Amino acid sequence: WRRGTAYLKHVEKEGSEQLRLTFEKGELKAVNDETFDDPIQAIQKVEEIGAAYGIGRDMHVGDTIIGIKGRVGFEAGAHRFLEKYTLSKWQQYWKDQVANWYGMFLHESQYLEPVMRDIEAMLQESQRNVNGTAILELRPLSFSTVGVESEDDLVKTKFGEYGEMQK
C-alpha cells in the first residue's frame, strides 16, 4: 500500500437498486430525496451507496506536466447525464471545449492566470439550467441511466417530437 493510491471498489451487494440524484444549478443537492446543505456530504452519500456495488471509482491514464504518463483514480457521477437533457447542443460543445482547456491549464500550474477566472465564470453560468433529478440503476460493477426529471428538460417540448420521447 502506498500513500495516495486509489483502488477500485469491491462488490459487497447483489441485485440492483435505483439511485436518484437531484441537482440545482449543477450542484448535487439530494440523494434519494434526502437533501444536503453540504455538497461534500451528498457526494459521500453517493459513494457509500455506489461502493457496495463496486462502482463509482475508475482509473485514468494521462500525460503529466513533466512529460511522463501518470495514473489517477477518480469518481464520476450523473451530472453529465442531466446536462445532456438541459443544455443545448452548442452549450454542451463549448462547455466541453472550455473544460478541457481549463483542465489542461490547471494541470500545467496556471491556476493564477487571470483567464482562469473568466473560464470559471463561463462554466458556472453554463450550469444555470442544470436542474432536476437523474435516475440511475445500480448493479454489481455497473450502472445505467434510467431517466431524468427536470423542468428544464429540453427533450420535452411543446414544439414537436423527434425520435423516442421521454414521458
PLM region spans:
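Nucleotide-activated chemistry modules centered on ATP-dependent adenylation/adenylyltransferase
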Residues: 1-167
